[in-house]
């Protein structure tokens, strides 16, 4: 495909997606919901697996228990090496922050660029870009090759947060310990800055020095994760599910929301890293399955924290899901079962990495533990 045609398609996609995000509620959601509900069964866990989980307690095997002990304190070790996760996380986050600082423009239009920088340079965990970098290195790639994609994923994640926080969506005033973008710059500037981040993400990712075939593959993966097979689908179902009676929905309904709204971008981050790193089809599929597990894991933990932590501890408004009548795992299956689900997803995620060497996989194993044990 000619670069000019590819750019035109991307531009049209970005403009239509930005319009969809900002005009989603409530009319389009009502039109969108039936088709979404018909696709709930494509979510991560099957109905039988969910039922089996709810009917039986989690039983960790001896190997799982031993591994938990080995990872205690952010350290993964075996007889051959020791991996310390905290220094790794800090180093990767610093590299990502530096790259983001350089990637976001500073000139005119000043207000838009200020809002973009305000939103994206706030103190975030950078889990998604770090996942991208770690997945690239897992299959033999280099950090610098995956950095443009890592930044692109963080730009899109930040765009989604800006949109989520708007009064027409989740109506939140606090994000990453600071007032949300629309509270500081107004709704108009917030919407425009989100659209600009979305556009910049694709532009920036194309600076990666990889083959044209892998670039098209990566662009397709990223675009798919944002639209009606990704973020938009999850957000649409989430909004349309507010206030539903628990008897009207099942666990697969909730899972559809979170697989598409939260897990999809974590999955995409990992897949992009593996694509750019030169991974084989088999390696990329293993990474995809792993990341899908930790993406859902991230959301289950988020639901637990929303119910058990304060706004000061979280850096965002606590208890907002309950107030808005949103579906959450604790609400649907209870707090204890939700915690057991965390253990199950953690174990499943690790199993998808068994084909890789212990040393190369250590950052992703430790990242899984970090996500499962995070407190904000």
UniProtKB/Swiss-Prot annotation:
EC number annotated for this UniProt entry: 2.5.1.-, 2.5.1.1, 2.5.1.29, 2.5.1.10
Tissue and organ expression note: Mainly expressed in flowers.
Needed co-factor(s): Mg(2+)
Domain of life: Eukaryota
GO cellular component: endoplasmic reticulum
GO MF annotation, one: metal ion binding
Primary localization class, coarse: endoplasmic reticulum
Pathway as given in its UniProt record: Isoprenoid biosynthesis; farnesyl diphosphate biosynthesis; farnesyl diphosphate from geranyl diphosphate and isopentenyl diphosphate: step 1/1; Isoprenoid biosynthesis; geranyl diphosphate biosynthesis; geranyl diphosphate from dimethylallyl diphosphate and isopentenyl diphosphate: step 1/1; Isoprenoid biosynthesis; geranylgeranyl diphosphate biosynthesis; geranylgeranyl diphosphate from farnesyl diphosphate and isopentenyl diphosphate: step 1/1
PROSITE patterns tied to this protein: POLYPRENYL_SYNTHASE_1, POLYPRENYL_SYNTHASE_2
Annotated cofactor note: Binds 2 Mg(2+) ions per subunit.
Binding locations of Mg(2+) 2: 164, 170
Residues at which isopentenyl diphosphate binds: 125, 128, 157, 176
Keyword annotations of the record: Carotenoid biosynthesis, Endoplasmic reticulum, Isoprene biosynthesis, Magnesium, Metal-binding, Signal, Transferase
Catalysed reaction equations from the record: isopentenyl diphosphate + dimethylallyl diphosphate = (2E)-geranyl diphosphate + diphosphate; isopentenyl diphosphate + (2E)-geranyl diphosphate = (2E,6E)-farnesyl diphosphate + diphosphate; isopentenyl diphosphate + (2E,6E)-farnesyl diphosphate = (2E,6E,10E)-geranylgeranyl diphosphate + diphosphate
Residues the entry annotates as binding Mg(2+) 1: 164, 170
Residues given in the record as dimethylallyl diphosphate binding sites: 175, 261-262, 299, 316, 326
One BP annotation, GO: carotenoid biosynthetic process
Keyword Aminoacyl-tRNA synthetase part of the UniProt annotation: no
Signal peptide limits: 1-24
Location(s), subcellular: Endoplasmic reticulum
Family in the record: Belongs to the FPP/GGPP synthase family.
Function field: Heterodimeric geranyl(geranyl)-diphosphate (GPP) synthase large subunit. In vitro, the large subunit catalyzes mainly the trans-addition of the three molecules of IPP onto DMAPP to form geranylgeranyl pyrophosphate while the small subunit alone is inactive. Upon association of the two subunits, the product profile is not changed.
Subunit structure: Monomer. Part of a heterodimeric geranyl(geranyl)diphosphate synthase. Interacts with GGR.
Protein name per its UniProtKB record: Heterodimeric geranylgeranyl pyrophosphate synthase large subunit 2
Species in which this protein is naturally found: Arabidopsis thaliana
């Amino acid at each position: 495909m000619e670069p000019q045609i590819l750019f035109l398609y991307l531009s049209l996609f970005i403009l239509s997606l930005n319009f969809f995000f900002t005009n989603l509620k409530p009319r389009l959601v009502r039109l969108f919901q039936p088709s979404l509900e018909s696709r709930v069964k494509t979510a991560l866990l099957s109905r039988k697996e969910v039922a089996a989980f709810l009917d039986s307690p989690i039983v960790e095997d001896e190997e799982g228990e031993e591994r938990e002990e080995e990872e205690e304190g952010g350290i993964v070790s075996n007889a051959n090496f020791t991996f310390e996760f905290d220094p790794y996380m800090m180093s990767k986050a610093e590299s990502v922050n530096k790259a983001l600082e350089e990637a976001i423009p500073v000139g005119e239009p000043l207000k838009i660029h200020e809002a973009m920088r305000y939103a994206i340079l706030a103190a975030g965990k950078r889990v998604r870009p770090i996942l991208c970098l770690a997945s690239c290195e897992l299959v033999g790639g280099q950090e610098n090759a995956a950095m443009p994609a890592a930044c692109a994923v963080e730009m899109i994640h930040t765009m989604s947060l800006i949109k989520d926080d708007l009064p027409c969506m989740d109506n939140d005033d606090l994000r990453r310990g600071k007032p949300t973008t629309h509270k500081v710059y107004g709704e108009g500037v917030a919407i425009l800055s989100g659209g600009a981040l979305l556009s910049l993400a694709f532009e920036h990712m194309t600076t990666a020095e990889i083959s044209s075939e892998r670039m098209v593959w990566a662009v397709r993966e990223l675009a798919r994760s944002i639209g009606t097979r990704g973020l938009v689908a999850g957000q649409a179902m989430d909004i349309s599910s507010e206030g539903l009676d628990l008897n009207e929905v099942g666990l697969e309904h909730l899972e559809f929301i979170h697989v598409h709204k939260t897990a999809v971008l974590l999955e995409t981050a990992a897949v992009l890293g593996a694509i750019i790193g030169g991974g084989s089809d088999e390696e990329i599929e293993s990474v995809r399955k792993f990341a899908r597990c930790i993406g859902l894991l991230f959301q289950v933990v988020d639901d637990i924290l929303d119910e058990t932590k304060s706004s000061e501890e979280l850096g965002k408004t606590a208890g907002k899901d309950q107030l808005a009548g949103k579906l959450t795992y604790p609400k649907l299956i209870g707090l204890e079962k939700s915690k057991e689900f965390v253990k199950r997803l953690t174990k499943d995620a690790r199993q998808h990495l068994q084909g890789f060497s212990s040393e190369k996989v250590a950052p992703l194993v430790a990242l899984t533990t970090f996500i499962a044990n995070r407190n904000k």
